[in-house]
């Protein structure tokens, strides 16, 4: 991570940290870095979610792009993966999404996609940061015909919807409940599932700029759970603010998280011989029950650090086609280059329809182990050195020995705060409490701060 760019672009409180001035500079410098080797007029696609600050930041960002001679295609409200898809299929120079994903409405963010539809490499982000920190802006300042032009491109949404529908099958007779989080999916999910002939019910479809992710969506699926039971739906599908993740609800109102969704889709692909190298890419936070289910069905796994960008890196390097996170980011590389909630939802319902199995039956193939996570405040200089403390290393080794292979311990530093995270999984809640609390007590004694 750099000074401005985090693991998912530039984020902050809109108009306080992520200001219009910064958005203008990101448009100007980001547009230049991503298009400097173009021979013709560069084209950049820009979209946003439904936050009240979106149009303010969009205007500033677009002005920056236009100031370096870029032709800007304004997509309006669109899911993040829609930008990625359109950039790649329409041969654009780059794409920019204005969103803070699952964060509350006061936050916003700006993330770039290269011409290949993938998020930027670290060296490209550092190049943009160097321009942001330079004492003087020395980039070209074209005038007259050298300036960029602005094109409204509402047909981008239709093209993305058509693509999504093309990946699915007829869902006639299936009751589907949708929660679009008052976010980007609110402009597309209804149309997509109606085109697939599903019988739908929808909540979270009235964005007002302030209610995105507010007690709704993939991080707050409680209302969707109620809707599924009220309507007798076969499945509930909850997206986040920019629709790059999915959390599902089965016909009984129970949550089906990213681990289970990945397993269901992965097993289906594996049985058809379509799972590349018969491998699913996951992160260290995936549940032990997910790993055991993969082992039982002869499916391989590749494990990365936390963050969908690391999952994508591993997928690209090793040519895997399915990966994701417990949080609901699922990347299906045969179709798109980033997590896509609506695409994942379509593939999940396809498996249900083709197998004739209910979602609860499909999800029951993975037994999720109880999990507990405790955050312990430590000196920032010590959070990366915890395993070098003899007492901490010893207690972890002792707890792992007691588990006898039927549990898991993960101790890792926070990426942004002076915290050490202690996580354990085991067959019962009592065992999880014992393992986590025992380790946490030693960590607090050795390196904890008040």
UniProtKB/Swiss-Prot annotation:
* Presence of the UniProt keyword Transport in the record: no
Positions bearing Phosphoserine: 101
Q: Which cofactor does it need?
A: Mg(2+)
The protein's enzyme class: isomerase
EC number in record: 5.4.2.10
The terms under GO molecular function for this entry are: magnesium ion binding; phosphoglucosamine mutase activity; phosphomannomutase activity
- Family classification: Belongs to the phosphohexose mutase family.
Function as written in the Swiss-Prot or TrEMBL entry: Catalyzes the conversion of glucosamine-6-phosphate to glucosamine-1-phosphate.
Tell me what this protein is called. Answer: Phosphoglucosamine mutase
Where does this protein come from, organism-wise?
Streptococcus uberis (strain ATCC BAA-854 / 0140J)
Gene (name only): glmM
């Amino acid at each position: 991570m750099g000074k401005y760019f985090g693991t998912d672009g530039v984020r902050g409180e809109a108009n306080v940290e992520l200001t219009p001035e910064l958005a203008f500079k990101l448009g100007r410098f980001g547009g230049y870095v991503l298009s400097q080797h173009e021979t013709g007029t560069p084209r950049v696609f820009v979209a946003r979610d439904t936050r009240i600050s979106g149009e303010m930041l969009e205007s500033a960002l677009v002005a920056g792009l236009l100031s370096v001679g870029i032709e800007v295609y304004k997509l309006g409200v669109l899911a993040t993966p829609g930008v990625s898809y359109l950039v790649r299929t329409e041969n654009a120079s780059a794409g920019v999404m204005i969103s803070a994903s699952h964060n509350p409405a006061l936050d916003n963010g700006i993330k770039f996609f290269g011409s290949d539809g993938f998020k930027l490499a670290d060296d490209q982000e550092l190049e943009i940061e160097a321009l942001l920190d330079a004492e003087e802006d020395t980039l070209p300042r074209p005038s007259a015909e050298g300036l960029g032009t602005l094109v409204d491109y509402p047909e981008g949404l239709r093209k993305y919807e058509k693509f999504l529908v093309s990946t699915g099958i007829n869902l006639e007779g299936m009751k589907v409940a949708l929660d679009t989080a008052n976010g980007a999916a609110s402009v597309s999910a209804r149309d997509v599932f109606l085109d697939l002939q599903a019988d739908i019910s929808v909540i979270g479809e009235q964005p007002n700029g302030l209610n995105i992710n507010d007690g709704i969506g993939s991080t707050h699926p409680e209302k969707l759970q109620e809707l599924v039971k009220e309507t007798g739906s076969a499945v509930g599908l909850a997206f986040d603010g920019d629709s790059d993740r999915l959390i599902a609800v089965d016909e009984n109102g129970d949550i089906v998280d990213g681990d289970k969704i990945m397993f269901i889709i992965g097993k289906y692909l594996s049985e058809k011989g379509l799972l590349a190298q018969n491998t699913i890419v996951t992160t260290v936070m995936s549940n032990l029950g997910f790993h055991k289910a993969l082992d039982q069905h002869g499916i391989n796994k590749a494990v990365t650090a936390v963050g969908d960008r690391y999952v994508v890196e591993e997928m690209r390097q090793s040519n895997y086609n399915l990966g994701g996170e417990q949080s609901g980011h699922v990347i299906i590389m045969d179709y798109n280059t980033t997590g896509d909630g609506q695409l994942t939802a379509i593939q999940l319902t396809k498996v249900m329809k083709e197998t004739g199995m209910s979602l609860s039956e499909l999800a029951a193939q993975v037994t999720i182990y109880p999990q507990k996570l405790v955050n312990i405040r430590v000196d920032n200089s010590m959070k990366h050195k915890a395993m070098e403390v003899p007492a901490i290393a010893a207690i972890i080794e002792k707890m792992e020995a007691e588990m006898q292979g039927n549990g898991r311990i993960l101790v890792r530093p926070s990426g942004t705060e002076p915290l050490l995270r202690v996580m354990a999984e085991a067959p019962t809640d009592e065992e999880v409490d014992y393992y986590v609390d025992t380790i946490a007590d030693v960590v607090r004694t050795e390196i904890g701060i008040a």
